[in-house]
Curated annotation (Swiss-Prot):
Keywords: RNA-binding, Stress response. This is RNA-binding protein Hfq. PANTHER family: RNA-BINDING PROTEIN HFQ. Pfam families: Hfq. Homohexamer. One of its GO terms (biological process) is regulation of DNA-templated transcription. The gene is hfq. GO terms for molecular function: RNA binding. RNA chaperone that binds small regulatory RNA (sRNAs) and mRNAs to facilitate mRNA translational regulation in response to envelope stress, environmental stress and changes in metabolite concentrations. Also binds with high specificity to tRNAs.
Amino acid sequence: MSKGQSLQDPYLNALRKERIPVSIFLVNGIKLQGQIESFDQFVILLKNTVSQMVYKHAISTVVPARNVRIAAQGEGENEASNA
């Protein structure tokens, strides 16, 4: 995993798992709203009344409806080893 992905993937994954509503602003100013259904290296699937595939290169900002807590790197591993 590259350094650029080390924050992005856990952040998007937390938004997806917790089904947090998000507003996604595109570089052209358009605002999209919905929940993150899935994502990969290049796209995000945003679900509202329909699913939209949004290319990451077109995204300016992702704004969650509430605060998101993402696990610090290695935090989940410590919990598993302490069990």
